[in-house]
Each structure stands twice: as structure tokens, then as C-alpha cells.
Design a protein with these regions (language model features):
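C-terminal transmembrane-helix exit sites in multi-pass transporters
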Residues: 109-131, 269-287
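Loop-to-transmembrane-helix transition segments
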Residues: 11-16, 64-89, 153-159, 210-243, ...
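C-terminal-most transmembrane helix of multi-pass membrane proteins
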Residues: 269-322
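Transmembrane alpha-helices of multi-pass small-molecule transport proteins
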Residues: 35-85, 163-171, 188-204
Length: 322
């Protein structure tokens, strides 16, 4: 196996693993949103756990904390701002929508990633991969059923989140030449901590609390001390964002963004699984059609990429220039 093929396969595995782990984050925050907690409190506790994991991995790897030093502070500030916007809009939308609906709506992000990777990064995206992404997005449309009233303020927030999420991955790809996955993840967690503490100082006493059921209720709730029974969810969010974030950053910094993006569709079946197991919700027939289109598109993209690589190697092999 060539170095390029090995790197691509590793990137795909990181993306799949990161998507599965990050699905636990959606599950836990969805549960916490129904338990009276404020979003900025959840993000703060999650970030403390996540940054502890990142620092622990750095210490265990023996690479030293010098790898957290950066010559690109402004790029990190811009990327952290985008990630923060993506998180806030997504989780506010998630608090108001069924888990599977929110995740399905968020899957416009891979389409944005593919578009940006071609236009901004200049990566080659063949017509078959474009077609596969289009089929996947058709599945998202089937899942969200806009004619049935799914397109609402909460769904618009998730769409905004998807655009910001795709933009953050373009930044990850550009910064990956000089910044490690550890560094990228560390500065995101620091940003979460700073913004959440600031937000808590302004709104944590509840004087900006919104009416129950309003769009911004989750964001402006007052802080309160979690009982032991709820700590599993806070720990799950921290572990998910720490481990899953590292895996996803590693995938995007080492592999073409257009190849990685379809494998984030693993979050869809995971959302179905968690929704059925924890919240007692299960997809109907229409939803299953959407899932088939989405997953089928991702698998087809993997197959097309494998065929393309084999052809490239067959052409290059006679000259030894691989």
C-alpha cells in the first residue's frame, strides 16, 4: 500500500471513529437541555473535561507541551470563533428538535465541505463524487421533510451551524500543515472556557432567562449545581469532545476534505440508535428512505475513491513514479 493510500485510509478511520464518539456529545447535550441546564454551563464543564483529556494525551505521548506553542494565534482565534458559532447554533437547535431531525439537517455540512474543498482548497472532486454527495443531500431532504414543517427557526440555526462547521474544517485543513491535532483541539477548548465563563458572568444569574419553549431558552437559563445523577452526561460530553475532536481534527489535517466529509454520515445511524435507546423515538418509513440514501452515498464515495486510486497506481507503476 502506498503512503498516500495508507494516509487516506487512516483519515477515513479517524473520521468514522470521531463521528461515532461525537454522537455521544449530541446525545448527552440533548439530555441536558431537557434537564434545566444552561448551554454555556454545559459547554464550560465539557471544555474543562475535554482540555484535561487533551493535556493527558500530550503528557502520555511524551511529545511535551511545547507543541501547544503556535505562530498562528490569529488563525486560531478565527477558527475558535467559527467553532463556537457552530456549537451554539447547533445545540440551541438540537434542544428544540428531535435528535435524528437535527442530525439529518446538519448533514448539509459535508456538502459545504465538498464545495469549499473544490473552490477554496483547489482539491479535485470528480463528477461521481459530486453525484454521490448530491444523492446524500437528497436523503437529508427526505429526512427533514420541509413540506411537513421541519424548516423552522431551530432548523435554520442548525443550517447556520452546518455552514460554520464546514468553514472550520477548511481552516483545519489549511492550518494542518503547521499545527498538530493537539494544538487545534487545545485552543478550541480554551476558547470554549473563556467564552462560557464570560457568558456565565453576564447571564448566569438568570436575569436574561427566556420563556419556556422559546428559541433561546437553553442559552439564557441560570446556572445550577448538577446532582450526581446528571454527571454522566457532563462527563460524556467532555470525553466526546476531547477524544472525538482529536480524531476528527487528525482526519481533516491529513486527508483531502472532500474524501473525509461523506464519512461523517456515520452520525446519522448513531443518532437513530441513541434516539431509540434513550428517548424512545424511532424513524418512520420516510426516514429510513433518507437514511438509505445518505449511507449509500457515503459508501459509494468510498468505493469510487478506491477505484480511482487503483487506476492512478496502475498508470503510475510502470514509470515507478508513485
Amino acid at each position: 500500500m502506498s503512503d498516500i493510500s495508507k494516509k487516506s485510509n487512516n483519515g477515513i478511520l479517524f473520521a468514522l471513529g470521531g463521528g461515532i464518539v461525537l454522537s455521544m456529545n449530541d446525545l448527552a447535550i440533548k439530555a441536558l437541555s431537557g434537564s434545566g441546564y444552561a448551554l454555556h454551563q454545559v459547554i464550560l464543564l465539557r471544555a474543562f473535561i475535554g482540555i484535561a483529556i487533551v493535556l493527558g494525551v500530550i503528557w502520555a505521548s511524551g511529545g511535551g507541551f511545547r507543541q501547544l506553542l503556535t505562530k498562528r494565534p490569529l488563525d486560531h482565534l478565527f477558527r475558535v470563533s467559527i467553532v463556537m458559532c457552530s456549537n451554539i447554533t447547533y445545540f440551541v437547535g438540537l434542544s428544540l428538535m428531535p435528535l435524528a431531525d437535527a442530525v439529518a439537517t446538519s448533514f448539509v455540512a459535508p456538502l459545504f465541505v465538498t464545495l469549499m474543498s473544490a473552490v477554496i482548497l483547489g482539491e479535485h472532486v470528480g463528477p461521481r463524487r459530486w453525484a454521490a454527495v448530491a444523492v446524500g443531500m437528497l436523503g437529508v431532504v427526505v429526512m427533514t421533510r420541509p413540506g411537513a414543517g421541519v424548516i423552522q427557526p431551530a432548523a435554520i440555526l442548525v443550517l447556520i451551524s452546518a455552514f460554520c462547521y464546514a468553514s472550520s474544517h477548511m481552516m483545519t485543513r489549511r492550518m494542518g500543515l503547521t499545527e498538530s491535532a493537539m494544538t487545534l483541539n487545545f485552543f478550541v477548548q480554551v476558547g470554549f472556557i473563556v467564552v462560557s465563563i464570560g457568558f456565565g458572568l453576564v447571564a448566569g444569574d438568570g436575569h436574561l432567562a427566556q420563556a419556556p419553549g422559546s428559541t433561546w431558552e437553553f442559552l439564557f437559563r441560570p446556572w445550577h449545581t448538577p446532582p450526581m445523577a446528571d454527571w454522566w452526561a457532563f462527563i460524556a460530553t467532555g470525553v466526546a469532545v476531547g477524544v472525538g475532536g482529536l480524531m476528527m481534527s487528525q482526519a481533516y489535517r491529513t486527508t483531502q476534505a472532500a474524501l473525509i466529509a461523506p464519512f461523517e454520515y456515520i452520525g446519522m445511524p448513531m443518532a437513530i440508535f441513541w434516539g431509540a435507546l434513550v428517548f424512545g423515538t424511532f424513524p418512520d418509513g420516510t426516514a429510513w428512505v433518507g437514511i438509505a440514501l445518505i449511507c449509500g452515498a457515503g459508501l459509494y464515495t468510498l468505493w469510487r475513491e478506491t477505484v480511482r486510486k487503483k487506476k492512478d497506481l496502475d498508470v503510475a507503476a510502470p514509470s515507478g513514479d508513485i
